[in-house]
């Protein structure tokens, strides 16, 4: 079991999300950086979909009530286990009574505290992920708060402490032109790929809002609501793009200029508020190769874990 002693961020329980329910209007949800969550679970010998604590930017203190292994992946935090500094992408042994403090993220946005065996929580629509709008999943569909107790499915077999290569963060996010790309003026197409974009403070798990050069359509475009997904880049009348994130709604009516490729969704999630990024066009073939590269990275972790366990 783990006791939450203090929380200063909107930390939630997340797994890989809800699959096959978007046609019913159910958001996918799940970890913002799914690659980081998968890496953490594999490092601990867990199934990839085991729920973890997603911590945005930092500000959580917790106490372990039993011996176990844990790791933190995703963002790079200032962390202390009692009075000893600990680091991201390392599997640590912890003893009952020890206290972990994740003070703040130095690099990146979302960290994933994974524990050996994962957390034991009731599922809502086949997932433990917290959906804050629907108020389902996790702990009563809400953010974690001081006093919460999280039951763990610990197998009581402590594994050696090992580290893995971290997932590199990016300030150039790769994307594909979307279905309405040709509806935008040529100069707006140029601006999208060539200019820098700043992530605004009103961004959240539903959507990342960027500020930059105004994107303009060739002519007014009336659209029926249509399916959208994590990574879709919508352009509302303001001309400032919104990239739909893990908690995004299932349909939308704004034209889309691009779609962030699957391989870079985690890197996009780790962009800090106020940071500036650029977008790079890739082909479908390149997108598939980059996705496979992520799977190779996870396969490498599996081999390391098999050798060290």
UniProtKB/Swiss-Prot annotation:
| Subunit architecture | Forms a complex composed of PxpA, PxpB and PxpC.
Species lineage: Bacteria, Pseudomonadati, Pseudomonadota, Gammaproteobacteria, Pasteurellales
Alphabetical UniProt keywords: ATP-binding, Hydrolase, Nucleotide-binding
Catalysed reaction(s) here are:
5-oxo-L-proline + ATP + 2 H2O = L-glutamate + ADP + phosphate + H(+)
Listed EC numbers: 3.5.2.9
Keyword Nucleotide-binding in annotation: yes
Entry similarity comment: Belongs to the PxpC family.
Instruction: Name the source's superkingdom.
Output: Bacteria
**Keyword Acetylation in record:** no
Q: Which InterPro entries match?
A: CT_A_B (IPR003778), Cyclophilin-like_dom_sf (IPR029000), PxpC (IPR052708)
Entry-linked NCBIfam families: urea_amlyse_rel (TIGR00724)
Taken from the UniProt record, the cysteine pairs bridged by disulfide bonds within this chain are none
Q: What is this protein called?
A: 5-oxoprolinase subunit C
Q: Tell me, in a sentence or two, what this protein's role is.
A: Catalyzes the cleavage of 5-oxoproline to form L-glutamate coupled to the hydrolysis of ATP to ADP and inorganic phosphate.
PANTHER family, per database record? 5-OXOPROLINASE SUBUNIT C
Molecular function GO terms recorded: 5-oxoprolinase (ATP-hydrolyzing) activity; ATP binding
Query: Which Pfam families is this protein grouped with?
Result: CT_A_B (PF02626)
